[in-house]
A protein has these predicted regions:
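A C-terminal functional module that forms or caps the active site or interfaces directly
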Residues: 257-263
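N-terminal basic, low-complexity leaders that serve as flexible interaction/assembly modules and, when applicable
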Residues: 1-46
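Conserved small/polar residues in nucleotide/adenosyl-binding loops
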Residues: 283-285
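Alpha/beta enzyme core
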Residues: 1-2, 35, 40, 47-252, ...
């Protein structure tokens, strides 16, 4: 597999990584319709764990079948497919080598009571990812949660193991819990902070939600206003989040968020493009 100058430039930012990890990143970046451009779209399918099967798949019954999601990622020309252990296992042989996969190694469910201390359980490991031929592991952290430190400690250990065997690391960094307000979960100061924490934890690919213009923290508001940090447009906010990830030296993917019509999806994609993000991860089936 040859790589393009755009992909080579991205890989050069990961100065400490071994050839195995860089090869797996290259597989993701060279896959699909955006292959070689430095942009990517990841299909994450962990809704069944998060919300239950009926809420996730009943509107589109073929989606109950794990093979559907592999096929969707392939037919749509996406960059990678991310899912929990059972979903990857169910299609690992049939689709081996056809689409880069990201094993989601922690998960949560909507039955738990945890408004101030949301967390996720570790549900798979690095050896599972190797056994299934995955290119990366994926892990969610909840900055702001009363259990955030435990989650950070877990991913620090998992990331070290993954990198040692040549796997890439994807961190979903979704602020929630603790003293954060609901609008604060997507506030620009909080999103940028959460993305920066994921970079500090060693993520190769960082996934956050598209930020709003809201500023949650009074201390941050003084800095944003005093330094005249531009957060007026979606593109300027994306640019600031990317800047917060080592000035663009890490791949930043933005969640697709709530379901949108075609115009809404295109507008969001343009903002991410104009802000220097590496595109979106869609979560709807």
């Amino acid at each position: 597999m040859s790589i393009t100058p755009a992909v080579k430039k991205i890989l050069d930012n990961y100065e400490s990584d071994n050839p195995g990890t860089k090869a797996n990143l290259a597989r993701i970046l060279m896959q699909g319709r955006l292959g070689g451009t430095g942009k990517l779209v990841i299909l994450p399918v962990d809704q069944g764990f998060e919300h239950g099967p009926a809420r996730s798949f009943a509107p589109n019954p073929p989606a109950y079948d794990p093979h559907y999601h592999f096929s969707l990622a392939l037919e749509a020309g996406l960059s990678a497919y991310a899912a929990p252990l059972g979903m990857i296992e169910a299609g690992a042989s049939t689709f081996a080598g056809q689409i880069p996969t990201i094993l989601k190694v922690n998960s949560a469910n909507s039955l738990a009571r945890a408004k101030e201390a949301p967390a996720q359980a570790i549900t798979a490991g690095v050896q599972d990812a190797l056994r299934l031929g995955c290119s990366a592991i994926g892990y969610t952290i909840y900055p702001g949660s009363d259990l955030a430190y435990d989650m950070m400690q877990d991913i620090a250990e998992l990331a070290a193991e993954a990198k040692s065997v040549g796997l890439a690391v994807v961190i979903w960094s979704y602020p929630r819990g603790g003293a954060l307000s609901k609008p604060g979960e997507t506030a620009i100061d909080i999103c940028a902070y959460a993305a920066h924490m994921a970079a500090l934890l060693g993520a190769h690919i960082i996934k956050v939600k598209p930020p709003t213009e809201h500023l949650e923290l009074d201390a941050a508001k003084k800095v944003y206003e005093g330094q005249k940090i531009d957060v007026a447009t979606a593109a300027s906010r994306i640019k600031h989040v990317v800047q917060s990830c080592f000035n663009g030296r890490r791949i930043v993917v933005f969640s697709g968020g709530e379901a949108k019509d075609t115009d809404g999806v295109l507008a969001e994609a343009r903002a991410i493009r104009d802000g220097g993000g590496n595109e979106i991860g869609r979560a709807h089936v």
